[in-house]
UniProtKB/Swiss-Prot annotation:
Classification of source organism: Bacteria, Bacillati, Bacillota, Bacilli, Bacillales
InterPro entries: Toxic_anion-R_TelA (IPR008863)
Protein's UniProt name: TelA-like protein SAV1406
Organism: Staphylococcus aureus (strain Mu50 / ATCC 700699)
Cysteine disulfide links: none
Family assignment from sequence similarity: Belongs to the TelA family.
Pfam family, one: TelA
Length: 378
């Protein structure tokens, strides 16, 4: 399977996740590029002093996009149930177990009648069952390939969601910096001017302007805090997306291992075991014929006996112990069982992510309601 390049490469948001303190959302201006600083200046100009309605709308579009993004993430987690993948893998394991290597073991002593009359029937029965199981395994392989394709598409979709979340994060960061920049400008320039004007004036409206400016700065500070909360949600969403991606990636790799390694190996080993069984029956039949000829040709009994022993010895050199085949099938079954464990872990992780995303969505809605509430009262 071709690995998704963007999934493997480091994303710029990873630096914020691993190195930065989550509560510290103030970004140093010297780290901004020239283009970013221009964007900050443009955004900062959108904040007009004493325009409370404009302040309430500042960054609200981004927060609405975050709400829509949370819905999309929740829908993604709820709609992607990997239960059918687990059922398919369980079915595959059942089919592989249905043909036991012990059934191909003919080391136990048998009578001449069993060798000649039942050996051929036993081989045909096992061969017929192997063909049936092999056909079923092929159908399961097609299903696994479809599951693998779906998982790969999901990984690519999650990459898109991750990049979109990163863009929200960056846009919110620029809005926060712009608001902080405007706040400093008002505190250090505009407010002192109004205070000085009020001190030199006897007009009560000048004093009211100072109070209005102070209240506006306070609302601006609260607006910055709300944007920081939204930015925090974007920050926490990133590792959750990666967590789901990692589970899907591991499951897709296990499916690929089953398709390209385990299943072909199982078919090859079964074919080899069946060939060895036929060889053993042929050797046993040859030994029986040699013994019968030895009884009839008494004159050459010793010579025939020696030839039979030598022939049997040479033929027996081709016998292979089936312990290796048993270990191989055990490893195949263990691989599939491990895949089922990963699938179960993935289901648990997605359930946990779903609960967390629902809580995050509820928190965001609560903040948006709290923002709109004071405006309506005023």
């Amino acid at each position: 399977m071709t690995e998704n390049k963007s999934f493997k490469e480091s994303h710029p948001l990873d630096d914020f996740i691993s190195d930065k303190e989550l509560s510290n959302t103030t970004i140093q201006k010297e780290k901004l590029t020239i283009e970013q600083q221009k964007q900050v200046d443009t955004i900062s100009k959108q904040i007009n002093p004493l325009d409370n309605e404009g302040l309430l709308a500042f960054g609200s579009d981004l927060q609405k996009q975050m709400s829509q993004f949370s819905h999309q993430m929740l829908d993604e987690v709820q709609s992607k149930d990997v239960g059918p993948i687990g059922d398919t893998l369980s079915d595959l394991m059942s089919k592989l177990k249905s043909v036991n290597p012990n059934e191909l073991n003919t080391d136990k002593p048998s009578m001449l009648k069993r060798i000649f009359s039942r050996a051929k029937s036993s081989i045909n029965e096992i061969f017929s069952r192997m063909q049936s199981v092999s056909a079923q395994v092929d159908r399961i392989t097609i299903q696994l390939q479809k599951h693998q394709t779906h998982l790969t598409r999901d990984i690519e979709l999650l990459d898109t969601l991750y990049d979109k979340n990163k863009q929200y994060f960056d846009d919110l960061s620029l809005h926060i910096i712009a608001a902080q920049q405007k706040k400093l400008q008002l505190e250090n320039e505009k407010l002192p001017q109004l205070q000085q004007q009020a001190q030199q004036s006897t007009n009560q409206m000048d004093i009211q302007q100072v109070s209005d400016m102070q209240q506006f700065i306070d609302r601006l500070d609260k607006r910055i805090y709300d944007l920081q909360l939204s930015r925090q949600i974007a920050l926490q969403t990133a590792p959750q997306i990666r967590m789901i991606q990692n589970v899907n990636q591991a499951l897709a790799e296990k499916i690929q291992s089953s398709i390209l390694t385990s299943i072909p190996l199982w078919k090859n080993q079964m074919a080899i075991a069946l060939t060895l069984m036929r060889q053993r029956n042929a050797v046993a039949a040859q030994r029986a014929v040699t013994d019968t000829t030895n009884d009839l040709l008494t004159a050459n009994a010793e010579m025939l006996k020696q030839n039979a022993i030598e022939t049997a010895t040479e033929n027996e050199r081709g016998i292979v112990d089936l312990d290796t085949l048993k270990r191989t099938q055990r490893n195949i079954i263990e691989t599939i069982e491990e895949t089922l464990i990963i699938q179960q872990h993935g289901r648990e992780e997605r359930q946990l992510a779903e609960k967390e995303l629902q809580q995050l969505e509820q928190d965001l809605k609560s903040h948006l309601v709290n923002i709109k509430g004071p405006n309506k009262q005023s």
